[in-house]
A protein has these predicted regions:
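N-terminal strand-loop element at the rim of the active site
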Residues: 5-6, 11-19, 33-71, 165-167, ...
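Conserved donor-binding/catalytic core segment of Leloir-type glycosyltransferases
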Residues: 9-11, 203-224, 230-237, 243
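A short, charged, and often flexible helix/loop element on the N-terminal side
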Residues: 58-82, 134-141
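A short, histidine- and acid-enriched strand-loop-helix "catalytic/donor-clamping" loop
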Residues: 68, 104-107, 124-141, 157-158
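An aromatic- and histidine-rich active-site surface loop
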Residues: 74-83, 95-128
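Membrane-proximal helix-turn-helix segments that form the acceptor-binding/catalytic region
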Residues: 141-159
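A short, active-site helix/loop in glycosyltransferases that binds the activated sugar's phosphate group
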Residues: 153-181, 188-190, 199
C-alpha cells in the first residue's frame, strides 16, 4: 500500500451501496464523486453479504451485528472501531482519519482515541442532530444519548456539522471543551422534472400550478415538525399551495 495514500475510515452508516438513510447516501455520494485519488476510503457495513468488497473505489468491510434491540447501533460502532484499529495495526498505517457518523459511543471513545493517536490517526465526528430529543426514545435512552454526545464532542479531534444550527449548538453547549468544528452542507442532485408527464398528470389532478407551491419531503416523525410547518402555513397569507 502506498505511503502517500490518505487513509479515511468511515463508521456509523449502515454501509454502501446505500439503500436508504442520510448517512448512507452521504457515504455513497462521497465515494461516488471522489476526485482526489490520493484518498483511500474504508467503509464499515452492517451485516453485509460479503466480508470484504469494493464499491466506488472504497474498501468496504462487513461487521456482523446481533439483534440486541436499541443497543444494536452501539454494538455496531464499537465493533467497527475495533475492526478499524486492527486493520491499522495489521497494515502498519501510521496516519489517517477515523470519521464517526453520529454520537452513539461516547462512553467508549476516549480509550480508542488514545489508541489511534498513538498511530498518528485523528478521530472526526459528525454529531448528526438532537437524537436525545427524539420522541421515540424513553427517558433513559435519551439520557444516554445526551451523555454520549457530550463525551464524543469532548474527545473528538474535529467535529463536522451538516447544519449551521447544530454547529452553533455544539459551540455553545460544549464551550468548555473548545471543540474544533466546521460546517459542511449536504449536496444534492438537482434535476428539473417539472415537464415530466407523470408530474403534469399529478399537478392537474391536484390543481397545483408550476412554481406556485411549497414542497416538503421527509418522514412523518415528530422531530421533523410537520405540525408546526402546516400550522404556520395555514396562518400565513401566501397564495401558494403546500405539497
Amino acid at each position: 500500500m502506498s505511503s502517500e495514500k490518505k487513509h479515511v475510515f468511515i463508521i456509523g452508516s449502515k454501509g454502501i451501496p446505500a439503500q436508504y438513510g442520510g448517512f448512507e447516501t452521504f457515504v455513497e455520494k462521497l465515494t461516488e464523486y471522489q476526485k482526489d485519488e490520493s484518498i483511500q476510503y474504508y467503509v464499515a457495513c452492517m451485516n453485509a453479504k460479503r466480508k470484504r468488497f469494493k464499491h466506488n473505489g472504497a474498501k468496504c468491510f462487513n461487521v456482523t451485528v446481533p439483534d440486541v434491540g436499541p443497543a444494536k447501533a452501539v454494538y455496531y460502532d464499537i465493533a467497527a472501531l475495533k475492526a478499524v484499529y486492527q486493520y491499522v495495526v495489521d497494515h502498519n498505517i501510521e496516519e489517517g482519519i477515523v470519521y464517526i457518523l453520529a454520537c452513539r459511543i461516547g462512553p467508549f471513545l476516549k480509550k480508542y482515541v488514545k489508541m489511534f493517536h498513538a498511530k498518528n490517526i485523528q478521530v472526526f465526528v459528525n454529531p448528526d442532530g438532537h437524537e436525545f430529543k427524539r420522541a421515540k426514545w424513553n427517558w433513559f435512552i435519551r439520557q444516554y444519548w445526551k451523555l454520549s454526545e457530550r463525551l464524543m464532542i469532548k474527545n473528538a479531534d474535529y467535529v463536522v456539522c451538516d447544519s449551521q444550527n447544530i454547529e452553533k449548538y455544539i459551540q455553545e453547549d460544549y464551550k468548555k471543551y473548545q471543540p474544533q468544528t466546521t460546517f459542511i452542507a449536504y449536496g444534492a442532485d438537482v434535476v428539473d422534472n417539472s415537464d415530466e408527464e407523470k408530474f403534469e398528470v399529478w399537478a392537474k389532478e391536484h390543481e397545483v400550478s408550476k412554481n406556485e407551491y411549497y414542497l416538503i419531503v421527509g418522514r412523518f416523525v415528530p422531530e421533523n415538525n410537520y405540525e408546526t410547518m402546516i400550522r404556520e402555513f395555514m396562518s400565513s397569507n401566501t397564495k401558494k399551495d403546500l405539497v
